[in-house]
């Protein structure tokens, strides 16, 4: 058996091929797993569990079917869907996890996270993140009418796209010191995350020992997952 990890699907109605690929994954590979972990940015945007978007209901039902089949499903918030709440988690049968979680997997201690907190060189993003994660601001935003939230979210996405276009790729990648610090804080030799859309397996030194950072790919033209078994940790790409 295996434990599966995915991230950065950025599901939206404008990308039906990705949605179809995810549904096939849920109906196939995911049903064979010991557990499924979604490490953020499942959706391109999330403005509240009360959004009646049919795509959200469709995804909730599909994930719930996996959970009901006996495969526990877990979710860590990303930078796009950090407002996903308890209502959607309940409807989809997912367990919400904190932004950093250590798992004991087949004899390995593995730290999992979305990954945006590791991009400490991007000071502008980190300042923005600190603001939008304030509970009072989230409560205020979620109390606004849905049409207002949609407008604000659209404006924020446009601003983010414009800001990122002028940033270097290095700034938007993880900071190596932040990676080592997180792994040593949790005393782990394995880290799995998404966010950067740069799938790879990186070797490093943490806790004065060899360590590994596995980065999930985004679902653009193909799927990406990390498959952890008793024998191996594999980064796998597959057609939709």
UniProtKB/Swiss-Prot annotation:
Organism name: Escherichia coli (strain SMS-3-5 / SECEC)
The protein's annotated pathway: Glycolipid biosynthesis; lipid IV(A) biosynthesis; lipid IV(A) from (3R)-3-hydroxytetradecanoyl-[acyl-carrier-protein] and UDP-N-acetyl-alpha-D-glucosamine: step 4/6
Stated role: Hydrolyzes the pyrophosphate bond of UDP-2,3-diacylglucosamine to yield 2,3-diacylglucosamine 1-phosphate (lipid X) and UMP by catalyzing the attack of water at the alpha-P atom. Involved in the biosynthesis of lipid A, a phosphorylated glycolipid that anchors the lipopolysaccharide to the outer membrane of the cell.
Alphabetized UniProt keyword annotations: Cell inner membrane, Cell membrane, Hydrolase, Lipid A biosynthesis, Lipid biosynthesis, Lipid metabolism, Manganese, Membrane, Metal-binding
Family: Belongs to the LpxH family.
Gene that encodes it: lpxH
GO MF annotations in UniProt: manganese ion binding; UDP-2,3-diacylglucosamine hydrolase activity
Binding site for substrate: 79-80, 122, 160, 164, 167, 195
One cellular component (GO) term of this entry: extrinsic component of plasma membrane
Source organism phylogeny: Bacteria, Pseudomonadati, Pseudomonadota, Gammaproteobacteria, Enterobacterales
Cofactor comment text: Binds 2 Mn(2+) ions per subunit in a binuclear metal center.
Protein name: UDP-2,3-diacylglucosamine hydrolase
Manganese is among the record's keywords: yes
């Amino acid at each position: 058996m295996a434990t599966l990890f995915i991230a950065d699907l950025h599901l939206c109605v404008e990308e039906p091929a990705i949605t179809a690929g995810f549904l096939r994954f849920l109906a196939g590979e995911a049903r064979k797993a010991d557990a499924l972990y979604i490490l953020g940015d499942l959706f391109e945007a999330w403005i509240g569990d009360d959004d009646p978007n049919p795509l959200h209901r469709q995804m909730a039902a599909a994930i719930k079917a996996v959970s009901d089949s006996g495969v526990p499903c877990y979710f860590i918030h990303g930078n796009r869907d950090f407002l996903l709440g308890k209502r959607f988690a309940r409807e989809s049968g997912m367990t919400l996890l904190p932004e950093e979680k250590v798992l004991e997997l087949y004899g390995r201690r593995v730290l999992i996270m979305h990954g945006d907190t590791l991009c400490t060189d991007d000071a502008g993003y980190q300042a923005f993140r600190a603001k939008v994660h304030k509970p009072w601001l989230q409560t205020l935003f979620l109390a606004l009418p849905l049409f207002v939230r949609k407008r604000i979210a659209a404006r924020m996405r446009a601003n983010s796209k414009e800001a990122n276009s002028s940033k270097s790729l290095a700034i938007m990648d993880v900071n190596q010191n932040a990676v080592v610090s997180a792994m040593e804080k949790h005393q782990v030799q394995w880290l799995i995350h998404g966010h950067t859309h740069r799938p790879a397996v990186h070797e490093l030194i943490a806790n004065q020992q060899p360590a590994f950072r596995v980065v999930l790919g985004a679902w653009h033209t193909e799927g990406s997952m990390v498959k952890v078994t008793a024998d191996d940790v594999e980064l796998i790409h597959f057609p939709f």
